[in-house]
Amino acid sequence: MENRDTILEENRSYWSGRAAGYSAVNRWELSTAQRQKWKDCLREELVRQFPARAMDALRVLEVGTGPGFFAILLCELGCDVTALDLTPAMLAEAKKNAGELAGKICWMEMNAEALTFADASFDAVVSRNLTWNLPHPDAAYAEWARVLRPGGLLLNFDANWYAYLFDEKAQAAYEQDRRNSAEQGVRDQNLESEGEHFDVMEDIARRVPLSQLRRPAWDLARLHALGLHARADERIWQRVWSEEERLNFASTPMFLIIARKGQC
């Protein structure tokens, strides 16, 4: 079996090269109605789990912050935010995007699969579009559970990205998404955002474990094994995606993993 530490370094290199382009996507989100949609979603989940707690009393960790989208929204909500990423280039973009809020967020370069925090350090751990790309997602979930306080909340937004590399039906649906985007005159986010890096990402996706596993079933099984109470909202995309995203990624709907530590 391939040494997945090699994949980790390839990820670091790939996302360093994608930092500027991915940051542009996040800035677009911050400048549109997507900003409020996502902020409302995060607020609702936090309030549901912590109805008696003020936002400024919640210590929240964002894993894989990228250009800082979630970190910025959580800071605007008033949370005490720590945001980590594997790549310094992404953290640099995140700080720029955060503007005046940058100084209120603790930015850290760190591996999502090997956190350096003490046990029970955070009330909530959040992540978006990260888990699928990890060489050791089982280790990542174990770490995220470890740093959660009793009664803590894990929110993980992800999708079956690159499942089309292993499934003929998924491949056909993916190709239909490309045709639909072209026919509707909508920019193809899947191809445009990655540009010349597309083949590199597909190569990595072929070698990480989650591209060929059924999700969110795998995630729920793993979290239950860790002792967390977990469920999946497989319609979250209907709430947070733009019309353009719905067209681009129709065959790969986003899901939300909601897991709680130590309580039902």
Whereabouts are the PLM-identified features?
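Core SAM-dependent methyltransferase catalytic element
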Residues: 243-264
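Class I SAM-dependent methyltransferase SAM/SAH-binding core
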Residues: 61-63, 67-114
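Short alpha-helix
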Residues: 209-227, 232-233
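A short glycine-rich, Lys/Arg-flanked "PGG" loop and its adjoining helix->strand segment in the class I
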Residues: 138-150
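Conserved class I S-adenosyl-L-methionine
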Residues: 1-55, 70-73, 153-192, 198, 202
